[in-house]
Amino acid sequence: MALFSGDLDLAEQLFQAAFEQAASQEQKAESLYGIGRTHFARRDYAKSADTFNRLLGQFPQSAVLANTYFMLGENYFRLGEFTQSANAYRNYAETSPAIIKDIAFTLQGDAALNAADYNQAITAYQSAMQANPETNTAYLNLQIGKAYDALENYTTAIQYYLSVYDATSDDLTKATANLLAGQAYKKMGLNEEAYARFLDSVIQFPRAFDSFTGLSILVADGVPVNEFQRGLVNYYAGSYDFAIRAFERYLDSNPEDNDGSAYYFKGLSHYFRGEYGSAISDYEQLIFGYPLNTYWAAAWDEKAHVLWVNLNRPTEAIETYLGFVMQSPTAAEAPAYLFEAGRVAERAGRLEEAALIWQRMMDDYPSAELSYRGLFLAGISYYRLNRYEDALSVFQRSLVLGTSPREKAKAYIWIGKCHQASGSAEEAEQAWQAASQADPTNYYSIRANELLEGLEPFTFDTRYDFGYSLELERPEAEAWLRSTFNIPQDFNLGELGELAENPRVKRMRAFWEVSRYRQATNEADLLRAELQTDIANSYRLLNLLLDLQLYQPAVYTARNIINLAGMDDLSSLTAPIFFTHVRFGAYFRELLVPIANDYSISPLLFYALVRQESMFNPYIASSAGASGLAQIMPATAKENVDLLRWPPNYDTADLQLGRVNLTIGAFYLNRMLTYFSGNMQAALAAYNAGPGNAEAWLALSGDDPDLFLEVIRFQETQNYLMQITEFLNIYILVYQR
């Protein structure tokens, strides 16, 4: 368990102690295997490989033999010993009964290809397809094509490339197949065939970088290319100067016979070069000359954005958005552009103008999704102007129009705030009482209770007791499952049963055993989706996931069971405590609790943060690049590692180690808490969106924490603060003593 959580020093100590105390040869082998995996997690690949080779020499009959070969393959590949890596993966495939042989064969092929052993690579990739027909055949066939290419068997290589082109529906893969086929044709001296492949990509897949590579070859060889398509490919590749030149040539040669799209992409290209005046000029060419163009509405938005964000001309930006709405009041974009006009006015400090624009949304577009939010923000604008009667009127309208308990609670909060600001304490209390009852597990109801008690956000008794046993809680959970879902008494919920033979269970375990945790989690997610309506086997899966410490899919599985029982957020807390402890677990407590305490962060709050950030998955990575349990961005991590002067020899990959990630996260949150003078709300906002943004929002809101939340510019950060509050509320309910 210490290995999975990233507490590598402890893991090595435990494995070493187990090795020394082992009563059998098999136990010694398993302990040595754990030591090797620990070195691998440290990225000490040479030491890891030595450990696994020692295991092979001392315990050649061990049950972990096959997995040892796999781990050797992983280490040798990272050490650049590709021939040894390929051999190790092949040995795994030959000795393992595991269901992930397709992965081993694929990795063998990759290693052999890097070792220039092309025939072995071809055989390995073909074996991968035979082992699992559902595997990624596009990747495998492209790799086989590359191997034949390297063997100078270009005809066969092209056959593989074009088979991928014909079979896949993915544009990027098609562009890759075209590029490889075209390059092979060129090697054969068949230039016309090569150019046909490159041109096909330029015309059909302009977003693909491989299309840009093909375009570069066409241009270098003097092959004529449609200038608009040439500009488009350059634009998507980030080659904005060449894109502009191509669009200009296209427009010069087609002054009348073009649909205006070139102006849009030329404008974008100027924008990314920082040439804002030229960008606006191009957008206006499209706006005034081509009202039927696909990008016509987008051009208005781009123009307004440049005026507002880049040129600091908010009046013209507002006029642009309002001009669009005036010209095209029935356009799908009209409500959003009206909302943006209000947003620009608000950012410019013109709060009354913003309020009037936002109020107009509900009048003109009552069914638009953004209109209710616009109405609410109108109330916030009046409140910031100290026009409490106007704000109260808007919030009362929001209350009437609100369709969800959350919207009702939110409106009541601000009705109460208006009464409080006007000196009507009794009416304020009545509104907050109503808010507290509207949606008890929701942020605004939680905040209403704090207001009734005169508390700031994140003010709570920090005492806790994380002592619980899921094992002791299972009997109650299973009895509840049987009575709620009519599961027969003779159905054994405590064992996997037939689920043990499920291919996804086997793959999940196999991936876990060779430290491929992301792939194990992916298999778990696929399986829980397949079992979504199978309560009994979902529960069996849940217990397996807990055993493997795959907490993220375990939480989702438990939530699905609760949903199928017809329970909402509030009533779910009346289910057996087992399910609440799974969904809001004190996971990794040996790491998280002392680390949180070391940096003066309540473990209850830190658990809420980690649950929000990663759902307790140490190996998760966001699309933005954040990684690990506390979702740290690489640049933020490096800054804090430099301040901590720990860990030694830090690498971004260390963010997947729980001890490293949690330490950096707690240290950074503590820094932000100190920077913002103990204001946890601002510190959390800074953790999510950066201290500069948090400072700006504090300046707008003064000392009002409720206003702080509403003036946050990023919906993600607003949701972040609300979710952490909601999760913290449950952690307090469950663990506070």
Language-model features: locations:
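Residue-level recognition of tetratricopeptide repeat
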Residues: 1, 37, 74, 110, ...
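Residue-level detector of the short coil/turn that links helix A to helix B
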Residues: 6, 43, 80, 116, ...
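Short solvent-exposed coil/turn linkers within tandem alpha-helical repeat scaffolds
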Residues: 19-28, 56-67, 91-103, 127-138, ...
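Catalytic glycan-binding domains that act on GlcNAc-containing polysaccharides
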Residues: 334, 348-353, 357-358, 385-386, ...
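Position-specific recognition of the canonical hydrophobic site in helix A of tetratricopeptide repeat
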Residues: 3, 40, 77, 113, ...
